[in-house]
Structures are given as C-alpha cells and as structure tokens.
Amino acid sequence: LENNETVSPSYFLRESGYFDEYSLSWSGNFNNRVFLGASVNIYDMKYQINSEYKENFSVVGGMSLKNYLSSSATGVGFRVGGIFIPADNIRIGASVQAPVIYTTKDINYADVYYNHGADNFGTIYTPEGDNNFKLQSPLVFNLSAALIQGKKGLIGIEYMNSSNNTAKFMNKNNNSFNYKYENDSIGAVFNAQHTVKLGGEYKVSNKFAIRAGYAYSTEPVKSRMQKEMNPNTNRTDLEYMVPSSTSYITGGIGYRDADWAFDFAVVNKMYDETFYAYNINKVADGFKMPTAVVSTTNLSFIATVSLRF
C-alpha cells in the first residue's frame, strides 16, 4: 500500500443445505400410568458455503479471497423416554438422546485474485482439499411436567440440557488422539446449553385444539470465545460467527379422531450472531475490520399425520 492509502473491505456469504431425520419408533402403555418410548434415528446432512472477502485500495487495485466448502454427514442415534402419571391431572416425563457419531466428509478450495497495477495482477488457485473424519454430538436429556386443567386444556414446562462442551472429533477408526487440540478447544469455549420451554393447549372441542408456546436457549459458547479463537486448519475460509441466546415463539392446531390425527405448528426462531470476517486478535488497533451483528429470524412450518392401528 502507498502512504495514506486506505482500504475498503466488503464481504459476501451464501449458505445452503439440509438436515433430514428418519425415525423408527416404539411405544408402550402400562396400566395407563407409565408410557415408555424408544426410537432409532438416521440423520443425513449437507451444508455448503460460498464466500468472498474483498479489499479495494483507494490508490490502485485491490484483492479478493473466494472460498467454497461442502460438508456432508450421516449418523445413527438412539432416543429413549417415558411419561409417568402420578395423578389424573399431572404428567411427569424424561428422555435421553444418546450421542450421535456422524461420519463426515469436507471438500474445500479457494482462489485469490490480486490487482496492484497494470502489470501486477492475477489469480492463484489452491488445490482441492478433502477431509474425512467423525464428529460425536453431545448427550441431551429432557425433563418435563404438565398440569391438565379438566377436559379443556393443559400447561406444560420442559427443561433440556445439551452438553455441547463434550462433543469431540475422531478419525475414521473412532480414535480422537489426532484431534486433541480441537477437542480441548471445544471444552474451553463451548457451554453446556440450557433450554426452557413453556406451552399450553386449549381444546375448543373434543377433537380440535389450539396451542401456543415460548422457549429460550442460553448461549452455546462462552463470551471469551472470540479471544480464544485460534483455528487449526489449512482451509482459507476465515469467517466465523459467535452466537448469542435464542428465543422461540410457537403456535399450532391439532385434530384427533379415533383412527387418525393431524397436527400443524409454526415455529419462529430468533437469534443474533456477531460476525467476524477473520480472526482479529493479532491485528493492530486501527486496522481491524469492524464486526457486524447478524439478526436471524427463521420461520418453520411443521405438519404431522398419525395413523392408529
């Protein structure tokens, strides 16, 4: 850069993907007082990201760094739970989601374009990188209670704990030795996440009901995460986000018949994230790119049809 030359940075990001779950479930009723259930769940996930970080120089030229990442994973999980009815108007429940081991494959590549005058410009391409590994998700458990108000409605509360700080990376042989740095970092910067849900249902008729609820999840990472962020990777996508707490507002309807049932729900998920284009810990004051707060609202529609045999 020339003396007194300024830099104008900008950033572009596009994400896409899906997360599918397929379940095989069993449930049992014991004297109308104890209800038990279990399910085997198959997960299929894909995530893609295209990003570009650009710097335009005030005197001449500029540079850009483009990145592509595709991550795919499959896993099998197990969930078990139960409901106990100590009195006709009280329900107490608990469930456990065992850690899921995902078999994961990452593919990434990048290119850097530079322009510093008529005779000094070009593009440099990285070789395509791929990485195969396994990721073990945390243990998740739920506790719940519900109070039934006659034949017209109920109020329920639920607590969920996800021990995010116990997740870990492993190689294809389920050995985590080569990922000691990454796994130690997970334990240092991730929190055990707590979620509280409160909801209610009112029966308009014997078959039709309306529902509403609210949920709150604490921050999944510690506040000092940004200061301790030191990625150990040969990838060149340097951006990352530090998430805050999450709120959910829900509403829905349900219809119950003798042989079938239909449920429809709307979930509005809201959270903020602090965006960093790169790790600014070692950048001198006055040269750091400003952070940005990204506010996300995710509206989901869920429909379920159940058949009784």
Each model region followed by its residue ranges:
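Outer-membrane beta-barrel porins/channels
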Residues: 1-309
